[in-house]
Every structure is written in structure tokens, then in C-alpha cells.
Amino acid sequence: MPLVIVVGNPRPTSRTLTVAAAAADAITRAAGLAAGRQTVDLCVLARHLLLPEPSPAVEDAIDQVTAADLVLVASPTLKGTYSGLLKVFFDRLPNRALDRAVAVPLMVMGGPQHARAVDAHLRPLLAELGAAVPAPGLAVLESDLGRLDAVLGPWAGQVARALEAFRPGSPGRPALPAAAHAASPARLGSAV
């Protein structure tokens, strides 16, 4: 199951990128996936995303994402939702571009008041693009960044269990129950 990480933070070497890489590692371990992944860090493409015609770098990023079986999409929480940079990139994708993919939403946030943004905003975007989103998104508080290895495990286990139905040899892509779209976000730190 090839894994592609999409990071929608407008800053290079962001905390969002660090969290996404750690989350991808945790999912890879928990699900027993082959090591290796591609990362699309949108801050590198930012100046190209609003051009009328996509640059070769943007086309390559789109190709990586649309060819992926598993897409981990990470964004900081900005103004209560995912970044505009992430939205601009996904607006470039054709309708139903993620029809064959399983997506995992993740957001990094300053405070618990935004914990629901991952499933209230990012999950519907991924579902609109056709992705299966069978596991709860992860809302990571900045205050928990120092203990990522300890807190990613339970969530990665949930994701791994959800991915079992999508492994090669399983009888087709299952229909997602309504609960898969309404699952509460897994959140690190204090209760909401």
C-alpha cells in the first residue's frame, strides 16, 4: 500500500511536517506496511499553485497523490480549519481523484477548541475527492509535540485496523458505514 504524505503548512520544515512524518511511521509500524513513502510538502509548491497552468512540479505532486493507495493529509489549524494552501492544491485535482485511495486526516493545533476541525472540515474535503476515510482523524495539540511517539500509538492502531479491509486480497473496497464519516476525532492531550 504506497503511502503519500501531503503537508499543507505554508512554512518550510514545519511542525506539521514533523508530526506527519511521525504519524506515517506509526501507521507503517502498526499496519505492517512496507517502509518507504513520498512526501508532498506544499510550501515548496506554493508559488506555483495559483498559476493558470500547473508547473511540472505541481503536475508531479498531483500524479503522486492521485496514484497513492494511502494518503496522509496534514495541515495546521488556521482560522479554525485546514490551510488555504491545502485547499488550493486539492482544488487542482480532478473530481473523484482519490477514488482508489484511503485517506487519513491529521491536523496540528494550538488549542483544544479546534479539535473537531479535523473531522468537521478536512474529512469532508477528502471524502468529496472520493477517498475512503475509515478511521478518525487525528487532532494533535502543539503542547503534545514533545511526546509524539507515546501518543501516536493508539491512533495508529485504529488506523491499522481500518486499513485491514483495504489490503490486497480483501474482497473489494468495502462500503463505508455512516459512522466512518461521523467518527469523533482522536485527539492528543486534554478532553474536549
Located regions from the model:
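Short, glycine-/small-residue-rich phosphate/pyrophosphate-handling segment
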Residues: 103-154
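Hydrophobic alpha-helical membrane-association signature
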Residues: 19-23, 118, 155
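A glycine- and small-aliphatic-rich helix-loop capping segment at beta-alpha/alpha-beta transitions
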Residues: 88-95, 124-127
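Structured loop/turn residues at beta-strand edges in well-structured enzyme cores
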Residues: 66, 96-98
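Glycine-rich phosphate/pyrophosphate-binding loop and the adjoining helix
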Residues: 134-192
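A short helix->loop->beta-strand "cap" motif at the edges of active sites that frequently abuts
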Residues: 34, 98-102, 131
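N-terminal beta1-alpha1-beta2 submodule of the flavodoxin-like/Rossmannoid cofactor-binding fold
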Residues: 1-91, 175-192
